């Protein structure tokens, strides 16, 4: 059973040899011919458990492991993995590959073998992502296997590509960010990544997907002091478009920075409350 109260408290005493003791399972799955490595954090108690894929940002220096543990304590499986071409995973890094890897992760979680081995409740599958992970989350929020999605300060690479042909300031800022992220990435460059955004801007731009997204259960958190996923660019445009079709978008504005550095517990509480509401929906 999922219980949001465990965001801020430890679970009751359990014996280490209890088969339902929390665990971390090292695992791997294949995405377009490449082996991806990851871990599944499994919670206390008997399953099946609601399960979320937790997607890190670009390139992944800001690791949301605290969020993974908080949600695991609440009673949820959490799958974490690195994208192709990042952090020692073989293959080439690209935003397109990241998108494909997310679909591969969903396929993996819904495979009969994974469902059995990890006690997965396939009626309660969720996507949670920060920054680039939020962008990836919103790209797959309409997948019918996903019950609801959480985007934490999503950074819209599609929008950057779409406006990059006429907004030199935003293009230059994005390019400089790409340059700082290359160390853990394989076979790419800031130039390659920027060109990929420019080539795919019309296809990836999230506001253009607003009609479809308006039919989904989505929480977006927004950091008021965020200088990366700037609100006026990466949230307000998208939210305005979604609200033209439906009012079911859940927004949470938090006075913090892009990493939620001083509000980690608050963002975890916010997400846990949203997930509990979704899990309790039939």
Report residues per predicted region.
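N-terminal cap/lid segment of alpha/beta-hydrolase-fold proteins
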Residues: 2-46
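Short beta-strand element of the alpha/beta-hydrolase
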Residues: 48-57
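The serine-hydrolase catalytic nucleophile loop
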Residues: 57-69, 232
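Conserved alpha/beta-hydrolase
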Residues: 68-90
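Alpha/beta-hydrolase active-site loop
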Residues: 93-119
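Alpha/beta-hydrolase fold nucleophile elbow
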Residues: 115-131
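Short glycine-enriched nucleophile-adjacent loop
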Residues: 134-144
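The alpha/beta-hydrolase serine catalytic core
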Residues: 146-148, 153-247, 252-262, 267-268, ...
């Amino acid at each position: 059973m999922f219980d949001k109260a465990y965001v801020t408290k430890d679970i009751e005493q359990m014996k280490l040899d209890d088969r339902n003791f929390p665990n971390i399972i090292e695992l791997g799955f294949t995405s377009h011919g490449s082996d991806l490595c990851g871990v599944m954090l499994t919670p206390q108690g008997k399953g099946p458990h609601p399960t979320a894929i937790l997607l890190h940002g670009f390139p992944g220096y800001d690791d949301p492991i605290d969020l993974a543990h908080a949600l695991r304590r609440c009673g949820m499986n959490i799958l974490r993995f690195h994208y192709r071409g990042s952090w020692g995973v073989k293959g080439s890094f690209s935003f397109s590959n990241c998108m494909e890897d997310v679909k591969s992760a969903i396929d993996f979680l819904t495979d009969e073998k994974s469902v059995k081995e990890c006690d997965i409740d396939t009626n309660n599958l969720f996507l949670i992502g920060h920054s680039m992970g939020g962008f990836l989350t919103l790209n797959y929020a309409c997948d019918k296997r996903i019950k609801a999605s959480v985007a934490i300060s999503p950074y819209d690479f599609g929008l950057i590509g779409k406006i990059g042909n006429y907004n030199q300031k935003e293009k230059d800022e994005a390019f400089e960010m790409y340059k700082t992220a290359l160390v853990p990435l394989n076979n790419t460059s800031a130039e390659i990544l920027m060109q990929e955004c420019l080539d795919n801007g019309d296809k990836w731009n999230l506001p253009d997907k607003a009609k479809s997204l308006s039919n989904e259960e989505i929480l977006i958190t927004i950091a008021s002091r965020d200088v990366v996923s700037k609100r006026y660019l990466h949230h307000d445009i998208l939210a305005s478009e979604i609200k033209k079709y439906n009012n079911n978008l859940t927004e949470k504005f938090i006075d913090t920075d892009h990493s939620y550095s001083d509000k980690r517990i608050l963002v975890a509480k916010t997400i846990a409350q949203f997930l509990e509401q979704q899990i309790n929906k039939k």
